[in-house]
Amino acid sequence: MYAIVKTGGKQYKVAEGDLVKVEKIEGEPGSAVALTPVLVVDGADLTSGDKLENVAVNAEIVEHVRGPKIRGMHYKNKTGYKRRWGHRQALTVLKITGIK
């Protein structure tokens, strides 16, 4: 069985036992979180829409990590202006423990 959940402005297809990297969620490693809203649940048949108001995906926070370095640069021609920047997104690794 799988479900599609929305967290951090993105949608993830998850199944029980999966490890998923999502946008940072506050909490200590080892604590439990419930992911809502659930958009789709697929068991014996496909379920979506208003029937999923009481459905949640339970997960456990495994660790907090940082994503890969993204580098960028601003450059203005003929003025000597250059600016380099970098960014590493804060991520949380979740282990999906159940879909209820």
Curated annotation (Swiss-Prot):
GO molecular function: rRNA binding; structural constituent of ribosome
GO biological process: translation
Highest taxon, organism lineage: Bacteria
InterPro entries cross-referenced by the UniProt entry: bL21-like, bL21-like_sf, Ribosomal_bL21
Signal peptide coordinates: none
Binding partners and assembly: Part of the 50S ribosomal subunit. Contacts protein L20.
Protein name: Large ribosomal subunit protein bL21
Species whose genome carries this gene: Corynebacterium urealyticum (strain ATCC 43042 / DSM 7109)
